[in-house]
Regions:
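OB-fold and OB-like single-stranded nucleic-acid-recognition modules
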Residues: 1-235
């Protein structure tokens, strides 16, 4: 009996192949960092391999002895499931910006592997500073280092009514994926007025001073930088 291609099996096999291709693309291009954290990066290569196997298996069984139809509901379902693949590949890569700040919670330190002893010693990073703001022990450890020089990178956010030489240096912290992103901010003073626009990425060097629940950096050097390849922090 002559075997023919099943529209349903071919379509689902193509869907698996499309998603597998997307995962391979994210893996090889490095764009996975725009969607997941380093903690959950394993999902990308695992998904690429498993979906490739699923696509090959489904397409291998797509030739059937009897004609099979593709119901309209199934066609719509496949189209909807394939839509994210089309959007991610068609649209230019984008990260969360200051526009999302009002829609994101502040960093609370859940799931953070930064202890007070880590904050008390070594070079201070943005994630150390963010973690210090989430608990009393961390803030106490940071206060003990008041006046030390730090270098932090982030994007510019200007608070309404703030002084012209002042910005909030901002980073998003992603624990699992970009959907759970929270924001961490440090107030930076002594910035050249009007030199930087909101969402510009900058590197700030200066002395750090915890003041109450806020952290301030008195900048001695500020310069523009390209957006990092991994713009989100992972605690």
């Amino acid at each position: 009996m002559k075997r023919g291609w099943s529209p349903s099996r071919t379509a689902t096999g193509g869907l698996f192949a499309a998603w597998a291709g997307l995962f391979w693309f994210l893996l090889l291009s490095g764009r996975w960092s725009l969607y997941v954290s380093t903690r959950t990066f394993w999902v990308v290569p695992t998904g690429a391999v498993l979906l490739s196997i699923a696509a090959a298996a489904r397409l291998a069984s797509a030739r059937v002895p009897r004609p099979e139809s593709l119901p309209t509901t199934t066609s719509w379902a496949i189209g909807v499931i394939a839509l994210p693949v089309v959007l991610i590949l068609a649209l230019p890569p984008a990260t969360l910006t200051s526009y999302a700040l009002g829609r994101r919670a502040g960093f609370v330190g859940s799931g953070v592997n930064v202890s007070a002893s880590d904050i008390a010693s070594g070079q201070l990073s943005f994630i150390d500073v963010a973690a210090a703001q989430s608990n009393k022990e961390g803030m106490a450890a940071l206060r003990a280092r008041a006046g030390e020089q730090v270098t932090l990178e982030g994007f510019v956010w200007q608070e309404e009514g703030a002084a012209a030489d002042e910005i909030l240096l901002t980073r998003y912290v992603v624990t699992c994926c970009v959907a759970d992103a929270t924001s961490a901010q440090v107030r930076v003073v002594n910035i050249p007025p009007g030199r930087f626009e909101p969402d510009d990425w900058v590197s700030v060097t200066g002395r750090i001073y915890p003041l109450g629940s806020e952290i301030l950096v008195d900048a001695s050097n500020v310069h523009a930088i390209p957006q990092p390849s991994r713009p989100y922090l992972t605690p």
